[in-house]
């Protein structure tokens, strides 16, 4: 370490400490009849995404990626999958960079693992594996920021 460096410069800026399934639920409410009803049909599959962050220690944060997927056919649920996939991250960054990294980069790192869990759960549930397309966490961050600004403007 040179005189110009500080100890924090030697530390990784972003460290993944652990990843885990915080909550997982999968159900096929109409089975076995729903398997017959969906033959040759393409259900509507809306995907709801949310990211929550909590501080768990000095520079350590839990980031939880929430996915709720409900396959619908003629207004009836074929399957419902809810996943909360979390990671604990240590950040050694300037204060102004922490919030965007927690809500953009950390969920981007978690997403491939959550995507794999979704594919495995649907396949193991007797359905074709649902392969989620990549998510744009930058756009989600911008939408969330715009929503918060609108709420603050109304207050």
UniProtKB/Swiss-Prot annotation:
InterPro entries linked: SecB (IPR003708), SecB-like_sf (IPR035958)
Keyword Transferase in annotation: no
GO terms of biological process kind: protein folding; protein tetramerization; protein transport
GO molecular-function term, one example from the UniProt record: unfolded protein binding
Subcellular location: Cytoplasm
HAMAP family attached to this UniProt entry: SecB
Quaternary organization: Homotetramer, a dimer of dimers. One homotetramer interacts with 1 SecA dimer.
Protein function: One of the proteins required for the normal export of preproteins out of the cell cytoplasm. It is a molecular chaperone that binds to a subset of precursor proteins, maintaining them in a translocation-competent state. It also specifically binds to its receptor SecA.
Similarity comment text for this entry: Belongs to the SecB family.
Protein name, as recorded: Protein-export protein SecB
Source organism: Paramagnetospirillum magneticum (strain ATCC 700264 / AMB-1)
Lineage of origin: Bacteria, Pseudomonadati, Pseudomonadota, Alphaproteobacteria, Rhodospirillales
Encoding gene (name): secB
């Amino acid at each position: 370490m040179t005189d110009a460096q500080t100890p924090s410069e030697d530390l990784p800026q972003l460290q993944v400490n652990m990843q885990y399934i915080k909550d997982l639920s999968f159900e096929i409410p109409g089975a076995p009849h729903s398997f017959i009803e969906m033959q040759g049909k393409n259900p509507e599959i809306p995907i709801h995404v949310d990211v929550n962050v909590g501080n768990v220690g000095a520079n350590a944060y839990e980031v939880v990626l929430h996915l709720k997927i409900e396959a619908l056919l003629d207004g009836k649920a074929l399957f419902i999958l809810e996943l909360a996939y979390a990671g604990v991250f240590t950040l050694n960054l300037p204060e102004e960079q922490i919030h965007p990294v927690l809500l953009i980069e950390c969920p981007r790192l978690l997403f491939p693992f959550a995507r794999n869990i979704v594919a495995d759960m649907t396949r193991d549930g007797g359905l074709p594996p649902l392969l989620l397309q990549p998510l744009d966490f930058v756009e989600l961050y911008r939408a969330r920021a715009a929503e918060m600004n609108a709420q603050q403007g109304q207050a």
